[in-house]
């Protein structure tokens, strides 16, 4: 369980780093803006460019968002209850878009995503293991 101030610092530093990062070869990605009640999920094997796609969508959207990469060692131990503090940060900033990279690292993440989708949040996630590639994921996100 992390204090809100620690989560805020990680969010801020990851955003600063993201803004400076080379986004690689830009891909033409369309259709995701129509997914108002669904999560946009980028999945695949490790090192295939999922994070780059997520970063490009975030940059191209130009809307305020929270981008969080869960492979950040500062987030080791992040758990479901920490999403509540992250949500407070989003609400205080008037943000309703999340970009979560390697979210499969967090146990129970599906319930947070499902709840936010029900509240019309825009959710973009990436992941690379069997858990995020599972056929059961759809039912976990839709109830």
Regions found by a protein language model. Give the residues of each.
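Phosphate-binding site recognition
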Residues: 1-143
